[in-house]
Amino acid sequence: MEEIIMYSTSWCVDCRRAKQFLKDRGVNFVEVNIDEEPDAEDLVLEVNEGRRKVPTIKFGDRFFACSPFDPYQLSSELNIPLKK
């Protein structure tokens, strides 16, 4: 599987849900907190047409926002099982 990077914040409920969804399925990912990494925040703004949407996920060479959290979207975008 290609590397998954989740751009998130510590206060984001949707980020916590997305992280738990991935952990429950044994999916490895790297988390980048955009409140602590200004360059990462700039990237999130760029790929979301100026919107600060978290979580934003990079999978391979493409980005998508999963905000609000949608397990069906996350499962489909990453090609992982919906059910544990």
Regions of interest found by a model, annotated:
Residues 13, 35, 65:
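Nucleotide phosphate-binding site architecture
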Residues 34-51, 78:
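Thioredoxin-like thiol-disulfide oxidoreductase module
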Residues 45-53, 64-69:
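Thiol/disulfide oxidoreductase modules built on the thioredoxin-like
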Residues 1-28:
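Local sequence-structure signature of Cys/Sec-based thiol-disulfide redox active-site neighborhoods
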Residues 59-84:
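Non-catalytic, surface beta->alpha helical segment in thiol-disulfide oxidoreductase systems
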Residues 16-20, 42, 69:
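Generic recognition of short, well-ordered alpha-helical segments
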